[in-house]
């Protein structure tokens, strides 16, 4: 599927008027569109090559935001209530709709969203081959080393993680291994109807929708993985789960926000992972001059 085709697939979830606005974009712009933003009271905008621009139509109505959710849920909000509580919906093709509105709270937790005020349709695109520049450096002797992918937000950590999972699972440039993925927010595999919407390989098992630490332990106990993967280490329990898994002989593959090894050592959350030698390789992603650059470093 081409980038423009992915755009056309994604916008089918929009109400009719907004869908027509989106499809008025030229094919070249469709291929470069990353997101469509719908804000009540303002015209819909498109994020194209990093720049947000209005599409020129009338302001988005609150009813259109409700229609968006009705279409995305196939007229069954109850079936997707757990996703809505987390602020997003995953639709066929791996595309994602982020939602904002008034939170309905119960016992200190978000139970639902009402009076929707904005939505963000993020267009999913598979980037097969993204891991090619780093694969040799991460697979000494043909087998994946414990690897941490590190970069500031928005530089492609998840894209690189997904393609590494796919390559390892398929035995592309390395030994084929069983991979288990804890995909808390569904951003890596984008499961829909029990199937990954984005390619993560034939030997990959996925659990999504639960906290990362719990997902890691579930996979470790139940699926016998050779590689355990997770996107975005963000909490102490994630660190504890990865440290425990490292002691079980499974290879680890993870991402984190940061700028380099010294940055991680200064932060209490990540310091134990480096001091205890949980990871053997570090991949840094930078974008000087607008082009991504990957650097592989040995950590031990």
Where are these regions (language model features)?
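N-terminal accessory targeting/assembly segments
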Residues: 1-93
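P-loop NTP-binding catalytic core
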Residues: 77-145
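Conserved P-loop NTPase
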Residues: 104-115, 280-300
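Hydrophobic anchor at the beta1->P-loop junction of P-loop NTPases
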Residues: 149
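Conserved lysine of the Walker
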Residues: 157
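Hydrophobic positions on the alpha1 helix immediately C-terminal to the Walker A/P-loop
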Residues: 160, 164
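P-loop NTPase switch/communication element
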Residues: 168-219
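Conserved P-loop NTPase nucleotide-binding/switch module
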Residues: 223-282, 287
């Amino acid at each position: 599927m081409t980038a423009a085709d992915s755009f056309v697939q994604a916008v089918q979830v929009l109400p009719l008027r907004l869908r027509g606005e989106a499809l008025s974009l030229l094919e070249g712009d469709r291929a470069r569109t990353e997101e469509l933003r719908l804000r009540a009271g303002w015209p819909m905008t498109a994020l194209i090559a990093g720049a947000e621009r209005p599409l020129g139509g009338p302001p988005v109505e609150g009813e259109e935001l409700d229609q968006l959710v009705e279409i995305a849920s196939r007229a069954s909000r109850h079936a997707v209530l757990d996703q809505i509580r987390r602020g997003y919906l995953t639709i066929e093709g791996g595309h994602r709709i982020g939602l904002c509105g008034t939170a309905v709270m119960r016992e200190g937790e978000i139970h639902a969203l009402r009076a929707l005020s904005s939505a963000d349709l993020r267009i999913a695109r598979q980037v097969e081959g993204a891991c090619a520049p780093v694969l040799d450096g991460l697979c000494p002797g043909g087998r994946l080393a414990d690897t941490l992918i590190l970069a500031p937000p928005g530089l492609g950590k998840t894209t690189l993680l997904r393609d590494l999972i796919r390559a390892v699972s398929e035995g592309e440039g390395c030994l084929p291994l069983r991979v288990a993925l804890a995909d808390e927010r569904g951003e890596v595999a984008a499961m829909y109807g029990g199937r990954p919407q984005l390619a993560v390989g034939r030997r990959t098992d996925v659990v999504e929708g639960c906290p990362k630490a719990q997902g890691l332990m579930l996979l470790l106990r139940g699926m016998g993985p050779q590689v355990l993967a997770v996107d975005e280490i963000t909490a102490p329990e994630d660190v504890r789960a990865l440290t425990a898994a490292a002691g079980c002989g499974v290879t680890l593959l993870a991402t984190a926000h940061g700028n380099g090894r010294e940055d991680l050592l200064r932060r209490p959350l990540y310091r134990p992972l480096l001091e205890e030698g949980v990871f053997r390789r570090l991949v840094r992603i930078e974008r000087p001059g607008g082009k991504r650059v990957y650097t592989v470093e040995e950590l031990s």
